[in-house]
Amino acid sequence: MGELIEYGKKALEYGNYADFKQTMDTVVEEVEEGFVKIGYLLKVARDTAVLQESGYATVNEFAEKEYGLDKSAVSRFIAINDRFAEGGYAPRLQEQYRGMGRAKLSIMLMLPEWINEEISPDYSKSDIQAIRAEVAEEEKTTDLEILMEEREDIYDRLENDLQRVLWKLGQDIPELYCKLWKEYMRADNVEQLAKEVMEIMAPAGEGMHSARISGIGRLMLSLKGADRDLVLINVRSGEKQRYGWDDMEAAFDLLMGSDSAEESWETVYGAEMPGVAPVQPESRKTSRVSPAVMEENNPAAGQN
């Protein structure tokens, strides 16, 4: 009982929320920065004579004997520091990667820089794993195989890659097309349209949608807010294209019409619309990543 009273007295040291929050923020930051500092110190041990008096011949031997870190763990800590620390050699993360944590950054080590630039700390580990799976899947196809792929005729008639991605997403996910059609028809202006599209395509406030375009490869559409440009990333080349919401409205002008979403879809894709699954209750945790639909899993592909 005396111990509980003692803890209670200590708790009184935080006289207000601001003091408590400042302390909490400091502790959390120390935990987040710990792994990058470990990588930095391991590099110091590797690159300087600091271990000379220790009796250890290598940094791997030192880390194993003193801290139980095997060779792969040492390599991972160092790689994270190389890639994400300030200047590639510092005890502190670059600003844009603070708050990520070791688990997320370990996955991001396997992603190209042009994709990592689009990932915020709000992306979950499973979101980043989904992005990694998309990149890994695209890596299975060689550049020569891309050149040999038969392109959809419609791709040459559309004006830009944003229109091509939206066309493909609509074909692959008729439910998405129907939701977007409804909001496009209701929107009075591009600002309203942008807000409604964000609610549909990025309800968590940001998100990525992947579509595979034959003859081009995977393109990932990054949405970060109704007041920010859309970014279209070529997974293979790293090329980034920026579009405004007026460009998305122009794409919908081309891809949507008729008196109903189903009639519009069938006109655009020249096929009978597949059965649309009933709307499911929203899960407690909203994914920020929508992977590409593969042709073999898409009943709508190849009908037109």
List each language-model region with its residue ranges:
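Short Lys/Arg-enriched helix C-cap and helix-to-coil transition segments
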Residues: 55-57, 85-104
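Long, intrinsically disordered, low-complexity Ser/Thr/Pro-rich regulatory/activation regions
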Residues: 100-120
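Short, amphipathic alpha-helical "recognition" segments used to contact nucleic acids or chromatin
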Residues: 36-56
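Accessory, typically intrinsically disordered or conformationally flexible segments
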Residues: 1-33, 37, 57-75, 86-89, ...
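Charge-rich, acidic-biased intrinsically disordered regions
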Residues: 49-65, 98-99
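Solvent-exposed, amphipathic alpha-helical segments
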Residues: 23, 41-45, 107-114
